[in-house]
Structures are given as structure tokens and as C-alpha cells.
């Protein structure tokens, strides 16, 4: 398995070490800002209802929802070569996020995040 693309990164390190009772908002906000910036050029109409996002990702990847499971799945399949680092981080974020933070207004309903996920889901279909 080739983990080189997703190890040695502070976002991935954070996802792997996150405690159930705490969220480092500074790291998350920095991550979200990078994701939002990168998604600005995506199709404005490419949105998915927020409540379907996590369910759809887990369904397509057959995951148990754990971050370790996500990383293992990505690294042991063609996804490692098909997804960009941003898309990998996006996938990790939505599978590992905690509800209190995910549903925060301005984060959960941000359309640029939905566009990033829409693009990712299309790519997941063509990867497998």
C-alpha cells in the first residue's frame, strides 16, 4: 500500500489523532478554507443535499465510518492514484467529522463544500 500521498500531512495527522470529545477548530478552519479556495472554480450547479453527503460517500466506499478505514480503503485501491490530496482530505473530513461541528451554520451549509463533494462523488464513480 502506498501511503505516501496521505501520510506526512498535518490534516491527516489531525484526523488520525482526533479525540471524540474535542475538535481543533483552528486546524479545521484552515483545512476548510483551503478546500473552499480550491473549489471556487467548480460548477455552481453541482450541489448535493447536505444530509446525503456522508451517507453517499460511505455507501460508495463500503466504509465503517472510521478514519483508519477510510485511509486503508484509499491506500489499498486505485483511489490513491485517482484522487487529489484535496479530495482525500475532503473525504476524510466528511467521514470523520463530529456532528456538532459539521452542522455549524456557515460550515455545513457552505455551497462551495457541497460543490467539492459533488465533484468528488463523480470522480469516485469513475475511479472504481
Model-flagged regions — what are they?
Residues 8, 17-19, 27-36:
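Long alpha-helical scaffold regions
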Residues 9, 24-25, 84-87:
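Intrinsically disordered, low-complexity coil/linker segments enriched for acidic/polar
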Residues 4, 80-99:
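Short amphipathic alpha-helical heptad-repeat segments
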Residues 93-128:
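Amphipathic alpha-helical binding modules
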Residues 1-22:
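Short, extreme N-terminal segment that most often corresponds to the first beta-strand
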Residues 20-27, 41-48, 79-81, 100-111:
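Charged, low-complexity interaction regions
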Residues 44, 48-65, 113-124:
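Repeat-associated, polar segments at repeat-unit boundaries in modular proteins
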Amino acid at each position: 500500500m502506498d501511503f505516501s500521498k496521505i501520510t506526512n500531512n498535518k490534516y491527516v495527522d489531525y484526523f488520525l489523532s482526533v479525540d471524540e470529545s474535542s475538535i481543533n477548530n483552528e486546524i479545521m478552519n484552515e483545512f476548510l478554507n483551503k478546500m473552499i479556495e480550491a473549489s471556487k472554480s467548480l460548477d455552481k450547479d453541482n450541489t448535493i443535499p447536505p444530509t446525503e453527503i456522508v451517507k453517499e460517500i460511505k455507501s460508495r466506499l463500503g466504509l465503517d465510518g472510521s478514519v483508519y478505514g477510510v485511509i486503508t480503503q484509499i491506500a489499498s485501491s486505485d483511489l490513491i492514484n485517482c484522487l487529489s490530496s484535496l479530495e482525500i482530505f475532503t473525504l476524510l473530513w466528511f467521514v470523520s467529522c463530529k456532528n456538532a461541528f459539521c452542522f455549524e451554520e456557515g460550515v455545513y451549509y457552505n455551497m462551495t463544500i457541497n460543490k467539492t463533494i459533488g465533484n468528488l462523488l463523480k470522480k469516485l464513480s469513475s475511479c472504481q
